[in-house]
């Protein structure tokens, strides 16, 4: 199928789907590989870091994340990759442990393009999920952008939008495409 339409918070019919708690994915599921491929393609086309299934109208507990490679600039100005891209297919994910310490950071969403706000999240999380091969996996004490993306995407699966996590709505700002930070799903 390829690119999918990303539902938007500002469309009342689409917001209804985005705020619905998703159903668990039943395994095995032969159509899952194509859906996951479509999700990655859609997420990359929208310059996102993560995408949850409800954002494309599928109310199942499925999300994809692609943390960009870490680059370092050399003294001569060239950039070199110091850590590769990290990709995850998260089927029926759940946060099993979370830090009591908060990390407040700028966050956006593909369902509200161009808008970002300061969102408090746990500084680290441990997440259990099923991978595309049907095996249970665990991401232990994820931090930084990965921790933020995991929490953001799992919120989508629970019908929670990032705007509901913002404590001070005055931090919700519109940015042009050029100045926008990386966007989670």
From Swiss-Prot:
One record GO biological process: translation
Pfam families to which the protein is assigned, alphabetical: Pep_deformylase
Active site: 153
Enzyme Commission code(s) on record: 3.5.1.88
Cofactor requirement: Fe(2+)
Cofactor binding mode and count: Binds 1 Fe(2+) ion.
Reaction it catalyzes: N-terminal N-formyl-L-methionyl-[peptide] + H2O = N-terminal L-methionyl-[peptide] + formate
EC class name: hydrolase
Iron recorded as keyword: yes
Keywords (A to Z) from UniProt: Hydrolase, Iron, Metal-binding, Protein biosynthesis
CDD domains with a match to the protein in the record: Pep_deformylase (cd00487)
Binding site for Fe cation: 109, 152, 156
Keyword check for Protein biosynthesis: yes
Entries under InterPro entries matching the protein: Peptide_deformylase, Peptide_deformylase_sf
GO MF, one annotated term: peptide deformylase activity
UniProt family annotation: Belongs to the polypeptide deformylase family.
Function: Removes the formyl group from the N-terminal Met of newly synthesized proteins. Requires at least a dipeptide for an efficient rate of reaction. N-terminal L-methionine is a prerequisite for activity but the enzyme has broad specificity at other positions.
Protein name: Peptide deformylase
Species of origin: Roseiflexus castenholzii (strain DSM 13941 / HLO8)
């Amino acid at each position: 199928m390829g690119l999918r339409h990303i539902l938007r918070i500002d469309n009342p019919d689409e917001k209804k789907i985005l705020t619905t708690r998703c159903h668990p994915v039943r395994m095995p599921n032969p159509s899952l590989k194509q859906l996951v491929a479509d999700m990655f393609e859609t997420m990359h086309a929208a310059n996102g870091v993560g995408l949850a299934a409800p954002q494309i109208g599928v109310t199942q507990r499925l999300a994809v994340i692609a943390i960009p490679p870490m680059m370092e600039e050399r003294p001569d100005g060239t950039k070199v990759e110091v850590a590769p891209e990290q990709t995850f297919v998260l089927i029926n994910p759940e946060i099993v442990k979370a830090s009591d310490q908060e990390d407040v950071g700028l966050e956006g969403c593909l369902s509200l393009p161009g808008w970002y706000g300061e969102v408090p999240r746990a500084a680290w999380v441990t997440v259990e999920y099923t991978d595309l091969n049907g095996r249970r996996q665990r991401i232990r004490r994820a931090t930084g952008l990965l921790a933020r993306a995991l929490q953001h995407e799992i919120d989508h699966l629970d019908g929670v939008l990032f705007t509901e996590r913002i404590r001070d709505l005055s931090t919700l700002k519109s940015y042009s495409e050029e100045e926008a930070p990386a966007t989670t799903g």
